[in-house]
Design a protein with these regions (language model features):
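Acidic/polar residues in short coil/turn loops that connect beta-strands
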Residues: 21, 59, 98, 135-136
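Aromatic/pi-system hotspot detector in well-structured domains
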Residues: 2, 15, 40, 52-57, ...
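Repeated scaffold domains used in trafficking and secretory/extracellular systems
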Residues: 5-6, 43-50, 81-84, 120-122, ...
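Conserved core positions of repeat-based scaffolds
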Residues: 14-17, 26, 52-55, 64, ...
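N-terminal non-cleavable signal-anchor helices
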Residues: 6-7, 25, 38, 44, ...
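Residue-level hotspots at or immediately adjacent to binding/recognition sites across diverse folds
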Residues: 10, 61, 81, 87-90, ...
Length: 174
Protein backbone atom coordinates (compact mmCIF):
# COMPACT_ATOMS: atom_id res chain seq x y z
CA UNK A 1 0.00 0.00 0.00
CA UNK A 2 1.39 3.33 -1.02
CA UNK A 3 0.98 6.01 1.64
CA UNK A 4 1.96 9.65 1.97
CA UNK A 5 2.58 10.03 -1.76
CA UNK A 6 3.26 13.67 -2.70
CA UNK A 7 4.07 13.20 -6.40
CA UNK A 8 3.07 10.52 -8.87
CA UNK A 9 4.52 10.13 -12.37
CA UNK A 10 2.85 7.50 -14.54
CA UNK A 11 4.84 6.25 -17.49
CA UNK A 12 4.63 3.86 -20.37
CA UNK A 13 6.13 0.95 -18.44
CA UNK A 14 6.30 2.18 -14.84
CA UNK A 15 4.78 4.48 -12.29
CA UNK A 16 7.05 6.34 -9.87
CA UNK A 17 5.87 7.81 -6.58
CA UNK A 18 7.66 10.28 -4.32
CA UNK A 19 6.68 9.94 -0.67
CA UNK A 20 6.62 12.69 1.95
CA UNK A 21 9.60 11.11 3.75
CA UNK A 22 11.81 11.42 0.63
CA UNK A 23 11.63 7.78 -0.41
CA UNK A 24 10.56 6.59 -3.86
CA UNK A 25 8.27 3.72 -4.86
CA UNK A 26 7.95 2.07 -8.26
CA UNK A 27 5.50 -0.30 -9.90
CA UNK A 28 5.06 -1.60 -13.40
CA UNK A 29 6.37 -4.08 -15.86
CA UNK A 30 9.87 -2.58 -16.07
CA UNK A 31 10.90 -4.92 -18.86
CA UNK A 32 10.10 -7.67 -16.38
CA UNK A 33 10.73 -5.82 -13.14
CA UNK A 34 9.99 -2.43 -11.59
CA UNK A 35 12.81 0.03 -11.00
CA UNK A 36 15.07 -0.79 -8.04
CA UNK A 37 14.44 2.44 -6.11
CA UNK A 38 14.14 1.05 -2.58
CA UNK A 39 17.48 2.57 -1.55
CA UNK A 40 16.71 6.08 -2.77
CA UNK A 41 16.55 8.52 0.18
CA UNK A 42 16.13 12.27 0.76
CA UNK A 43 14.55 12.69 -2.68
CA UNK A 44 12.88 16.01 -3.53
CA UNK A 45 12.06 15.49 -7.21
CA UNK A 46 11.40 12.49 -9.49
CA UNK A 47 11.42 12.16 -13.28
CA UNK A 48 11.10 9.37 -15.81
CA UNK A 49 10.93 8.57 -19.50
CA UNK A 50 10.36 5.29 -21.27
CA UNK A 51 14.10 4.69 -20.96
CA UNK A 52 15.00 5.66 -17.41
CA UNK A 53 13.97 6.82 -13.95
CA UNK A 54 15.77 9.53 -11.99
CA UNK A 55 15.56 11.57 -8.81
CA UNK A 56 17.18 14.65 -7.27
CA UNK A 57 18.09 14.59 -3.58
CA UNK A 58 17.91 17.43 -1.07
CA UNK A 59 21.70 17.80 -1.37
CA UNK A 60 21.54 18.16 -5.18
CA UNK A 61 22.86 14.73 -6.08
CA UNK A 62 21.08 12.35 -8.46
CA UNK A 63 19.89 8.76 -8.57
CA UNK A 64 19.30 7.39 -12.09
CA UNK A 65 18.54 3.92 -13.51
CA UNK A 66 18.06 2.57 -17.02
CA UNK A 67 14.65 0.94 -17.53
CA UNK A 68 15.87 -2.11 -19.41
CA UNK A 69 18.57 -3.15 -16.95
CA UNK A 70 18.12 -1.31 -13.63
CA UNK A 71 21.78 -0.33 -14.04
CA UNK A 72 22.89 3.17 -13.02
CA UNK A 73 23.05 5.87 -15.69
CA UNK A 74 26.82 6.33 -15.80
CA UNK A 75 28.08 9.87 -15.41
CA UNK A 76 25.38 11.05 -13.02
CA UNK A 77 27.26 9.90 -9.92
CA UNK A 78 29.48 13.00 -10.07
CA UNK A 79 26.68 15.53 -10.56
CA UNK A 80 26.39 18.19 -7.84
CA UNK A 81 23.99 21.07 -7.11
CA UNK A 82 21.27 19.72 -9.43
CA UNK A 83 17.97 21.62 -9.24
CA UNK A 84 15.99 19.95 -12.05
CA UNK A 85 16.02 16.89 -14.32
CA UNK A 86 14.83 16.28 -17.88
CA UNK A 87 14.91 12.66 -19.08
CA UNK A 88 14.75 11.56 -22.69
CA UNK A 89 14.60 8.03 -24.03
CA UNK A 90 18.36 7.50 -23.97
CA UNK A 91 19.74 10.48 -22.05
CA UNK A 92 19.29 12.46 -18.85
CA UNK A 93 19.84 16.18 -18.41
CA UNK A 94 20.45 17.94 -15.12
CA UNK A 95 20.19 21.67 -14.46
CA UNK A 96 22.72 23.01 -11.96
CA UNK A 97 22.10 25.78 -9.46
CA UNK A 98 24.43 28.07 -11.47
CA UNK A 99 22.51 27.58 -14.74
CA UNK A 100 24.65 24.97 -16.48
CA UNK A 101 23.27 21.82 -18.12
CA UNK A 102 24.94 18.47 -17.50
CA UNK A 103 24.12 15.36 -19.51
CA UNK A 104 24.59 11.59 -19.37
CA UNK A 105 23.47 8.69 -21.51
CA UNK A 106 23.84 7.36 -25.02
CA UNK A 107 22.66 10.21 -27.26
CA UNK A 108 25.99 11.75 -28.25
CA UNK A 109 24.36 14.50 -30.31
CA UNK A 110 22.40 15.85 -27.36
CA UNK A 111 25.23 15.30 -24.87
CA UNK A 112 27.54 17.35 -27.09
CA UNK A 113 25.00 20.08 -27.91
CA UNK A 114 24.12 20.99 -24.33
CA UNK A 115 27.61 21.00 -22.81
CA UNK A 116 28.15 24.72 -23.44
CA UNK A 117 24.67 25.95 -22.49
CA UNK A 118 24.83 28.59 -19.73
CA UNK A 119 22.39 30.87 -17.90
CA UNK A 120 19.66 28.25 -18.22
CA UNK A 121 16.65 28.54 -15.90
CA UNK A 122 14.54 25.60 -17.11
CA UNK A 123 15.04 22.39 -19.10
CA UNK A 124 12.58 20.04 -20.79
CA UNK A 125 13.03 16.86 -22.80
CA UNK A 126 10.94 14.42 -24.78
CA UNK A 127 12.07 11.24 -26.53
CA UNK A 128 15.02 12.49 -28.57
CA UNK A 129 14.80 16.27 -28.21
CA UNK A 130 15.62 18.96 -25.65
CA UNK A 131 14.61 22.55 -25.00
CA UNK A 132 16.14 24.99 -22.53
CA UNK A 133 14.94 28.40 -21.39
CA UNK A 134 17.61 31.05 -20.80
CA UNK A 135 17.50 33.84 -18.26
CA UNK A 136 16.93 36.25 -21.16
CA UNK A 137 13.74 34.45 -22.21
CA UNK A 138 15.25 32.74 -25.27
CA UNK A 139 14.68 29.06 -26.04
CA UNK A 140 17.48 26.72 -27.14
CA UNK A 141 16.66 23.46 -28.96
CA UNK A 142 18.58 20.37 -29.99
CA UNK A 143 17.86 16.79 -30.91
CA UNK A 144 16.29 14.67 -33.61
CA UNK A 145 14.50 17.01 -36.07
CA UNK A 146 11.63 14.53 -36.27
CA UNK A 147 10.80 15.33 -32.64
CA UNK A 148 11.31 19.10 -32.84
CA UNK A 149 8.17 21.05 -33.68
CA UNK A 150 8.92 24.74 -33.64
CA UNK A 151 7.70 27.26 -36.13
CA UNK A 152 8.88 30.82 -35.86
CA UNK A 153 11.22 29.98 -32.98
CA UNK A 154 13.53 32.80 -34.03
CA UNK A 155 10.69 35.22 -33.15
CA UNK A 156 10.14 33.84 -29.66
CA UNK A 157 11.02 36.43 -27.02
CA UNK A 158 10.37 36.83 -23.32
CA UNK A 159 9.31 33.21 -22.87
CA UNK A 160 8.59 32.51 -19.19
CA UNK A 161 8.05 28.76 -19.05
CA UNK A 162 8.57 25.59 -21.08
CA UNK A 163 6.02 22.80 -21.14
CA UNK A 164 6.74 19.43 -22.72
CA UNK A 165 4.48 16.50 -23.38
CA UNK A 166 4.32 13.37 -25.46
CA UNK A 167 1.23 12.07 -27.17
CA UNK A 168 2.37 9.99 -30.08
CA UNK A 169 4.84 12.75 -30.93
CA UNK A 170 6.83 15.35 -29.10
CA UNK A 171 5.98 18.98 -28.60
CA UNK A 172 7.49 21.92 -26.77
CA UNK A 173 5.39 24.95 -26.01
CA UNK A 174 6.75 28.25 -24.74
Amino acid sequence: HWRNVVELIPGRHHTLALCADGTVLAAGQGYGQPYAVSGWRNVTQIAQSSGLAAAVTASGTVYALWADSNEPVLGTESWQDITALAPGDDFLLGLTADGRVVAAGHNEGILSAVKDWRNIIQIAAVSEAVAALTGEGRVLFCGNPRFLRYEGMECWQNIRQLVSYQNGGSVFVG
